[in-house]
């Protein structure tokens, strides 16, 4: 009986090491050995919004006046590679209409080792775009209306994706001569002739993959530039 109990305990302990969901959390590095053991497919998934994630979103990206139903959103988990070659678990909430396309794009970017520094839910920055962009975070859903309208923005519907936000800023020159740069710390990256690991260039892999899925790139806009931004 004692031997049987010991065997059961050993099996239980060994089983703990086979439970990946608690071991690989968003933002954490994953070793190549772990990826080989579990397989890449294990890390790429689309699901309805889990209860714990929906609680996190309350009052942040999912505001009290949110007109987008929870059922319209999807939670993506993936892997991405930073400029130092580290494999990192990423997460993103998007509209279900683009979820499959976005996951496919992120998987291809990972396979090509296209560098993405950070991919966490913007709720960890209290849905503050400026703070999250300064952290070079990549994200999608954040409910809001277009300024001075009752129209929900593309991000507000989860139909826009921002990639490597610090190095690919939003830039607009107003009629009064004032410049708008978001995030404010991204002014050094307005010169698109320079090369930075996290900079999106027209024609690069990130650009081509999003365009192939029918997304529009903010870097192509005429009256402003939003180099981080892809939308449908």
Outline where the language-model segments fall:
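Mid-length scaffold segments of soluble, non-membrane domains
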Residues: 116-117, 131-165
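Active-site-adjacent structural elements in enzyme catalytic domains
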Residues: 44, 58, 62, 93-111, ...
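Bacterial N-terminal signal peptides that target proteins for export
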Residues: 1-8
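Bacterial N-terminal signal peptides
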Residues: 8-16
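Catalytic cores and adjacent binding grooves of peptidoglycan-active enzymes
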Residues: 146-148, 158-232
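N-terminal module-boundary/linker segments of secreted carbohydrate-active enzymes
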Residues: 24-81, 85-86
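Active-site acidic/histidine clusters and adjacent loop/turn architecture
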Residues: 68-133
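Sec/Tat signal peptide C-region and signal peptidase I cleavage site
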Residues: 19-23
């Amino acid at each position: 009986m004692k031997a049987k109990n010991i065997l059961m305990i050993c099996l239980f302990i060994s089983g703990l090491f086979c439970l990946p969901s608690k071991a690989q959390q968003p933002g954490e590095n994953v070793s190549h050995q772990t990826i080989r053991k579990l397989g890449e497919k294990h890390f790429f998934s689309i699901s309805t919004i889990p209860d714990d994630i929906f609680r996190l979103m309350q009052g942040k990206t999912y505001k009290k006046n949110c007109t987008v139903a929870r059922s319209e959103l999807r939670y993506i988990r993936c892997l991405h590679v930073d400029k130092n070659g580290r494999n990192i678990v990423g997460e993103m909430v998007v509209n279900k209409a683009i979820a499959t396309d976005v996951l496919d794009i992120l998987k291809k970017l990972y396979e090509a080792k296209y560098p993405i520094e950070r991919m966490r839910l913007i709720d960890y920055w209290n849905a503050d775009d400026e703070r999250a962009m300064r952290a070079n975070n990549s994200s999608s859903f954040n409910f809001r209306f277009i300024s001075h309208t009752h129209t929900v923005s593309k991000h507000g519907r989860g139909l826009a994706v921002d990639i490597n936000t610090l190095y690919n800023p939003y830039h607009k020159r107003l009629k009064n001569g004032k410049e708008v740069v978001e995030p404010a710390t991204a002014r050094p990256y307005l010169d698109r002739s320079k090369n930075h690991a996290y900079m999106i260039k027209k024609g690069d892999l990130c650009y081509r993959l999003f365009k192939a899925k029918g997304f529009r790139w903010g870097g192509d806009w005429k009256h402003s530039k939003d180099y981080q931004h892809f939308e449908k």
